[in-house]
């Protein structure tokens, strides 16, 4: 007897329209298993002595489905989408591009990344500037407050409008409290003060603030650092996450800061500068901010490079610095000529070098 094996695939959809389930039917047909009661060629169906009695063959069987189901793996539930981060209390909409910069001291932006800032103002961009230290130079909070006033007045000069500024104390999702200032007539401009202690030219700080510094915090030598006005101490993680939060909250598409530690142009710069550049780099990298939208300002070493500013841009840069310096008793200069004549400051004013 020759058995013929027939295999047919069965495909179906689940009631939910999910993936197809596949099984197989196996059937067997006996080709010689069909007989008649009349025998063959008129020969009687009654058995004779010379032939053995025939055993009736069973009728051909119908295909019987194989009811054994092929094991099917349980569907794997997709991973849930991560919850979106909470909206920052510092969330600030802007209808144009946003230039954010992060600096150590209250004049670093005016000296080392201008006229880039002037160009941002001229283009109608939103400008958000963050200062990490109180720029107190060990001289106390009164001196620091004067420098803050100088910065706000310099920004009035750069934006081409005079007016009062309003302060908003904001506690970020990171837990860090910031002092956020904007002109009453222009929310597109924001200046943020964190007021951490000035680290001094040698990075060792000042007796007045207990010799605690931002470079020590960034290096891990210090667990936390308190603002000079008595706020809650910040850890390095809190500072980094705060900057990341502000980059997102401000919808930044252009970021400026100091040259980070360990890079070619960090040598010879103020330790607060390179520490600020380092923590800012960690902040933008943590959120995947595009590296090609970040520029690092060369600091003190610009004085050794060729002067590259002149004409109207230089005049406007010097004018903004002059307005600031009127509130800074250390670098005060009453005219453009006097500012340009100041050792080191005059050289920095005539230069701007940015690295990527």
Feature names for model-found ranges:
Residues 17-91:
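N-terminal low-complexity, Pro/Thr-rich disordered segments
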Residues 229, 250, 254, 269, ...:
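The feature marks non-catalytic terminal segments
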Residues 243-261:
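Proline-aspartate-enriched helix->loop->beta-strand connector
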Residues 79, 134-137, 196-199, 260-263, ...:
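Short, solvent-exposed loop/turn segments at secondary-structure junctions
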Residues 239-242, 261, 270-276:
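Catalytic domains of cell-wall/extracellular-matrix polysaccharide-remodeling enzymes
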Residues 30-33, 39, 83-245, 249, ...:
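Active-site rim/loop-helix segments in enzyme catalytic domains that contact anionic ligands
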Residues 1-9:
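N-terminal export and membrane-targeting signals
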Residues 138-146, 264-273:
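Short, flexible/disordered intra-domain loops and linkers
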